Amino acid sequence: MLNHTERAEVLVHALPYIQRYRGKIIVVKYGGNAMISNELRETVINDIILMKCVGIEPIVVHGGGPDISDLLNRLNHKSEFINGLRYTDDITIEVVQMVLGGKVNKNLVSLIEKFGGKAIGLCGMDGSLLKAKKIESDNDLGYVGEITKVNTEILKTTISSGYIPVVGSVALGEDDNKAYNINADTCAAKIASALKAERLILLTDVPGVMKDPKDISTLISTLRLHQIPKLCLEGIIKGGMIPKIDCCVEAIRMGVEKATILDGRVPHSILLELFSNEGIGTMIY
């Protein structure tokens, strides 16, 4: 337990970082075990509220894969994945809208309100916040889309009114006005890019990019863009890490200052990443 002096020193240590990020937009993709564990969920929400309280402008983007699968199971409708993406037929897209625009989104908003923050829940269909087109691939994915446009004014208005935007990753078709399921990492990256955010943070269930996935001491703390192709060729960046890295790279090329892949299983990982020299994830810039 910290004594009073040590607590004061922690706050003083954080001051330069608070000053650095004050007024800056930081997009947090919220997912993984941090959404499932009640304890972790509360620490993430408190981190986000604290960011807002000290003048940082957080935007929360979320998926809801486990909840979508759970509801589909209860409807006796099979979940099917193709290359890591959920095949989204007519029934599935209805469930996606209910979960991402309803249950998960509103639960996060109510939790933020419970702990003293102010939040507004949105999905990409609200005010045409997110426009998308169908992903064309060799294997038909159904109503799975890629974002073509972000209505930044909705987010800026929400922020300037003192609220934390909480965005569910479902979008409106640019041509057919139908709902499209969007990968949450991609959604967060597109929003960060459109707003030229200071930081993009992807919460996940691994510490970051590691040379040896079984050895935390091999965590790569910082990555420059030019180093990434070599790590892919060496097989260090592989599997599910590849699309996350791709999201970060795209965001940086579109004007985001830095992107971080962060272990959401670590309590207060967002604050540890933002308010210390060392950070705890893999920062890409």
Swiss-Prot record:
Its EC number is 2.7.2.8. It is found in: Cytoplasm. Pfam families: AA_kinase (PF00696). It catalyses: N-acetyl-L-glutamate + ATP = N-acetyl-L-glutamyl 5-phosphate + ADP. GO terms for cellular component: cytoplasm. Keywords: Amino-acid biosynthesis, Arginine biosynthesis, ATP-binding, Cytoplasm, Kinase, Nucleotide-binding, Transferase. GO terms for biological process: arginine biosynthetic process via ornithine; L-arginine biosynthetic process. Belongs to the acetylglutamate kinase family. ArgB subfamily. Catalyzes the ATP-dependent phosphorylation of N-acetyl-L-glutamate. This is Acetylglutamate kinase. It comes from Clostridium beijerinckii (strain ATCC 51743 / NCIMB 8052) (Clostridium acetobutylicum). The gene is argB.
